[in-house]
Regions:
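Short amphipathic helix-loop junctions that connect adjacent transmembrane helices
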Residues: 2-19
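Helix-to-loop junctions at the C-terminal end of transmembrane segments
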Residues: 33-46, 134-135
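Cytoplasmic membrane-interface "Motif A"-like loop-to-helix N-cap segments
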Residues: 42-56
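C-terminal ends and interior cores of transmembrane alpha-helices
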Residues: 55-72
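Intracellular juxtamembrane helix-capping segments at the cytosolic ends
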Residues: 89-104
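A late C-terminal transmembrane helix in Major Facilitator Superfamily
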Residues: 106-136
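A membrane-interface helix-boundary motif in multi-pass transporters
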Residues: 129-152
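Multi-pass alpha-helical transporter architecture, strongest
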Residues: 146-166
């Protein structure tokens, strides 16, 4: 979440270098999630994979919020970084695959670009809002809110018919 760097560096005292190192290492898990998620999306469908990854990400946020006693454990924080990166990779590639499926072939490049721009806009707005609500929520509360926001759009996956656009 947008709170992670503040929590890890300022509250848990990791330091910028240590946080950057482990965040960089966790990025490899995101790459693995993207590659593996692509294969799985081809096998079970991008809607189902997006739903599973979104639920997994929300669950990981709830577990993290509930396990405050483990926050001082470097292994727990690194595990959370890896899990978040991996599940985010699976989620994003599944959403990308779904966006490609629902794009109308005649204007697919333009339509897909618009979908990607909206996904990037939502991430940017989310990061920006983090600063605005920082004083209103505890770190634990932020992760609970993140879990709720992660689950909020998932029911929309049920009404998307990838074959309707074609």
């Amino acid at each position: 979440t947008g709170y992670s760097p503040v929590l890890i560096v300022e509250e848990l005292g990791w330091g910028v270098e240590k946080n950057a190192t482990w965040t960089g290492i966790a990025t490899w898990a995101g790459l693995g999630g993207s590659i593996g998620g692509g294969f799985l999306a081809d096998r079970v469908g991008p809607r189902r994979m997006a739903l599973l990854a979104g639920c997994g990400l929300a669950l990981s946020y709830l577990v993290f919020a509930d396990a405050r006693g483990l926050w001082r454990s470097d292994s727990f924080i690194v595990g959370m970084m890896v899990a978040e990166a991996f599940l985010s990779g699976v989620l994003f590639v599944s959403i990308f695959a779904l966006c490609m499926q629902v794009s109308w072939p005649l204007v697919a490049a333009t339509q897909f670009t618009a979908y990607m721009a909206l996904l990037n806009l939502s991430r940017t707005l989310g990061q920006g809002l983090t600063v605005e609500v920082a004083d209103l929520v505890t770190f634990q509360g932020a992760y609970v809110v993140a879990a709720g926001l992660q689950l909020l759009p998932l029911p929309l996956l049920a009404i998307i018919d990838p074959h309707q656009a074609r």
